[in-house]
Amino acid sequence: MFSKKITALALVSAVKAHGTVSGIVADGIYYDGYNPSYQYTSPAPVTVGWLIPKDLDNGFISPAAYTTSDIICHVDAAPAQIEAPVKAGGKVELQWTPWPVSHKGPVIDYLANCNGPCETVDKTKLQWFKIDQVGLISPTAETSGLWGTDVLIANNNSWTVTIPSDIATGNYVLRHEIIALHSASSVNGAQNYPQCVNLAIKGTGTAKPAGVSATSFYTPTDPGIQFSLYGTLTSYTIPGPALYSGAISVTQTLPAAPTASATGVYTVS
């Protein structure tokens, strides 16, 4: 039974796979991301990435589901049971499975304070503030333009985000997302790939930015959601709330080798 389940999973993934975060590097320490195949192992690995066992095809959330809880951290996502420690002002690298070149679009990052343990947080109560966004970089650099996803691919399918240095110590969820626009010219054609990671952030800051619910981020007809990737491009409006004033931009470069690996930590006090 075990081998049959794994074989079925492999076949589905081969046909429909797009991408998922397979690894996280927080302040130079590597952590495994979640893989849906873990549900077929005993004991299942404990990861800092949120659990998405129903995402068997590494699939997406469509605009039709923007008002449902699936847009928060992916389909039927459940909180990770450990957290990766990172300093305020530190860097978190998200390592994706190989991303398709044709799936161009923005890369966006949000944070939400769990106001307690993230392991037991009600995801529908999380209030998110945007800390990073890269959309259309150059409309004429290549066919369909140069996008955040192209930079991600060029950086070994990885993306680095800096944690704002002014935020208060606490337990947070990092929501990292790619929005693929290759079919977005029609309503419900955009493809959202949200991935969530538990972080234990420590610093000297006191800021507690206001946020919004993920179910209010986007609508199916937002100009950055229903968008034609093909033809003459002039501009692109990145969807979602405004960027947090304390956000720190990152110049994406080829990632450095992790200094160590770990399985995660439990909640910081």
Curated annotation (Swiss-Prot):
<feature type="binding site">
    <location>
        <position position="103"/>
    </location>
    <ligand>
        <name>Cu(2+)</name>
    </ligand>
</feature>
<feature type="binding site">
    <location>
        <position position="182"/>
    </location>
    <ligand>
        <name>O2</name>
    </ligand>
</feature>
<keyword id="KW-0119">Carbohydrate metabolism</keyword>
<comment type="function">
    <text>Lytic polysaccharide monooxygenase (LPMO) that depolymerizes crystalline and amorphous polysaccharides via the oxidation of scissile alpha- or beta-(1-4)-glycosidic bonds, yielding C1 and C4 oxidation products. Catalysis by LPMOs requires the reduction of the active-site copper from Cu(II) to Cu(I) by a reducing agent and H(2)O(2) or O(2) as a cosubstrate.</text>
</comment>
<keyword id="KW-0186">Copper</keyword>
<keyword id="KW-0624">Polysaccharide degradation</keyword>
<feature type="signal peptide">
    <location>
        <begin position="1"/>
        <end position="17"/>
    </location>
</feature>
<feature type="binding site">
    <location>
        <position position="18"/>
    </location>
    <ligand>
        <name>Cu(2+)</name>
    </ligand>
</feature>
<protein>
    <recommendedName>
        <fullName>AA9 family lytic polysaccharide monooxygenase I</fullName>
        <ecNumber>1.14.99.56</ecNumber>
    </recommendedName>
</protein>
<dbReference type="GO" id="GO:0004497">
    <property type="term" value="F:monooxygenase activity"/>
</dbReference>
<feature type="disulfide bond">
    <location>
        <begin position="73"/>
        <end position="196"/>
    </location>
</feature>
<keyword id="KW-0964">Secreted</keyword>
<dbReference type="InterPro" id="IPR005103">
    <property type="entry name" value="AA9_LPMO"/>
</dbReference>
<dbReference type="GO" id="GO:0005576">
    <property type="term" value="C:extracellular region"/>
</dbReference>
<feature type="binding site">
    <location>
        <position position="191"/>
    </location>
    <ligand>
        <name>O2</name>
    </ligand>
</feature>
<dbReference type="Pfam" id="PF03443">
    <property type="entry name" value="AA9"/>
</dbReference>
<dbReference type="GO" id="GO:0030245">
    <property type="term" value="P:cellulose catabolic process"/>
</dbReference>
<keyword id="KW-0136">Cellulose degradation</keyword>
<feature type="binding site">
    <location>
        <position position="193"/>
    </location>
    <ligand>
        <name>Cu(2+)</name>
    </ligand>
</feature>
<keyword id="KW-1015">Disulfide bond</keyword>
<dbReference type="InterPro" id="IPR049892">
    <property type="entry name" value="AA9"/>
</dbReference>
<keyword id="KW-0325">Glycoprotein</keyword>
<keyword id="KW-0479">Metal-binding</keyword>
<keyword id="KW-0503">Monooxygenase</keyword>
<keyword id="KW-0560">Oxidoreductase</keyword>
<comment type="similarity">
    <text>Belongs to the polysaccharide monooxygenase AA9 family.</text>
</comment>
<feature type="glycosylation site" description="N-linked (GlcNAc...) asparagine">
    <location>
        <position position="156"/>
    </location>
</feature>
<dbReference type="GO" id="GO:0046872">
    <property type="term" value="F:metal ion binding"/>
</dbReference>
<keyword id="KW-0732">Signal</keyword>
